């Protein structure tokens, strides 16, 4: 009984801020979302989906390396992955602008190729990947580390290459943890505000549009977009969680 009461208390603490949506309704005074809100939803969902493809393709090999390797280079790589998670997101946005801005060396290189990395869809993708990639790598590394390497070695004795052994044995066995990693990265990507505010204020995603609505229209104006944010972001984590429990 005491344990159940404690768990209910924790859940109530987490749910308390969300009760504001019930008190104010998903739609403020019965009004609909503005065209800018709908554009922000599309930007976040499309940009977030593309970013997740990049994150999984780039982050999974890195997570495998961190989980299966040893040595000082691994410690250095882990530090590099953790550093973006330890810094304020506004500071990360400023640093990205310094490196990829139009007057920076890398910014000029991409600019010569016709790719602007500030206030463009490409900049939104860059900021989203940079925000969510470390979260995915850390979670995926933990999931892969739980799979005994003996299974990979057994597959290699049966003729698999190291790559095929990881692809056919390790990753399927780590699928529950990898599903959690994808869910965390998805939520992190769609909820990022600080980096995108500096690097990709336009086109605005949902977090930046929420901030703009508060500035222009007041606190009550954000409830429609907050409700849509939850409706847009929750299905993927819930679906992945159900699939992970079903297998």
Write out the residue ranges for each language-model feature:
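Short hydrophobic faces within alpha-helices
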Residues: 83, 150-156, 222
């Amino acid at each position: 009984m005491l344990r159940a009461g404690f768990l209910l208390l924790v859940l109530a603490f987490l749910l308390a801020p969300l009760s504001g949506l019930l008190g104010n309704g998903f739609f403020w005074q019965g009004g609909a979302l503005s065209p800018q809100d709908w554009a922000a939803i599309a930007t976040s969902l499309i940009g977030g989906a593309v970013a997740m493809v990049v994150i999984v393709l780039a982050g999974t090999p890195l997570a495998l390396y961190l989980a299966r390797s040893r040595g000082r280079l691994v410690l250095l790589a882990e530090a590099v992955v953790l550093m973006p998670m330890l810094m304020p997101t506004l500071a990360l946005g400023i640093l990205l602008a310094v490196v990829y801005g139009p007057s920076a060396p890398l910014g000029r290189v991409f600019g010569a190729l016709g790719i602007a990395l500030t206030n463009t869809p490409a900049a939104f993708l860059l900021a989203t990947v940079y925000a969510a990639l470390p979260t995915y790598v850390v979670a995926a590394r933990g999931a892969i580390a739980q799979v005994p390497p003996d299974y990979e070695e057994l597959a290699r004795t049966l003729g698999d290459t190291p790559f095929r052994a990881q692809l056919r044995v390790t990753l399927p066995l780590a699928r529950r943890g990898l599903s959690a990693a994808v869910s965390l990265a998805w939520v992190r990507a769609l909820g990022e505000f600080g980096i995108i505010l500096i690097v990709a204020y336009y086109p605005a995603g949902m977090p930046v549009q929420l901030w703009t609505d508060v500035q222009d229209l007041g606190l009550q104006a954000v409830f429609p977009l907050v409700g849509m944010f939850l409706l847009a972001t929750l299905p993927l984590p819930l679906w992945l969680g159900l699939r992970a429990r079903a297998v």
